[in-house]
Amino acid sequence: MEKDRARRPLFELDEVPQAAKIKVIGLGGGGGNAVSRMMAAQFTGVDFIVANTDMQALRASPAPVKIQLGAKLTQGLGAGSNPDVGRNAALEDPETITRLLEGADMVFITAGLGGGTGTGSAPVVASLAKDLGILTIAVVTKPFTFEGRRRMLQAEAGMDALRNVVDTLIAIPNQRLLSVVDRGTPLLEAFKVADTVLQQAVQGISDLILVPGLVNLDFADVRTIMSGMGMAMMGTGVGKGEHRALDAAQKAVASPLLDDTSIEGAKGILINFTGGADLSIHEVEEGARIVQEAAHEEANIIFGAVIDPSLGDEVRMTVIATGFSEKKTQTEPSGKVVDLPRAARQAPAAAPAGSTAPAWRRKYESRGDLDDPLAENDYDVPTFLRRSAD
């Protein structure tokens, strides 16, 4: 008896899941395409769901879980680009959606806004997820200008509805893809690039939780930065050479693809560096300082680092910035759409006195740390998109 008591542990640890449960639900045609691309890229560690009013699109999806929205309302024929139909279709059977979302710690909602199903159903699905206490993040695209004013207005209305029911909203304007793809890029390829951007946004966040790190980030860290934060900015960058971490940081905070937001003024920031075994603390500090100087002085910054030998001499940085003031996110002007080949041939104009360039850029320009290889028209474009444009 005494021996048995002596062998007993002084305390017992309750078993807990090793990782947060993450689900990705693609709504409508755009969201479904994004899920297909994520699966083709062998994006693992998450559960995929697609939901659509169009039965033909559902049958073609490789997703293991499929939801037909509005079977009675639309007869499987789609929403006819009418968001009201998309909304009512999602409301036809909310119990099924809720059942398939249950058990998740985090849900990503992906959709292309402007049409019927994605625009109308996304706020409904987000509201159901929030009712379950799930951290809910929407990653959506906005239409190209050539898709017409009505589609853009519907997208803006969808954005407004989503803002009220998600924890974090990341919006990617398709129009800005014109600044990072070649003029001869076929239309279908341009839409594929939009799907890739959605994939990068979702994977950039989920990897922070799912991939073990030298300095670990976990679901609690991500929840701290993204819960109830509204509009967000997410950027990724890859650097090589002597100032590779600095290079990666500059690319990550200067993405031209994210909707009317920059890192300046952010009050919540999550940073993740990934590099080979030779990644040094001084490199990480140099890159993180770029982000720190651009953010709000009282920003809550959470940092993680992952060793991935497959990267070789490259360093990859992911930054997620949240907590922007409403005034900033609503009034900051959109970036110009430029012809990339033409822009690449032109030297950037000198900044006028009292320039409003980001603090990190002014500082490093004054120190001479920004060499020609990091000129603005180059480092503003994420590496994976430059490769797509080549």
Model-identified regions with their sequence ranges:
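Tubulin/FtsZ superfamily GTPase core signature
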Residues: 1-390
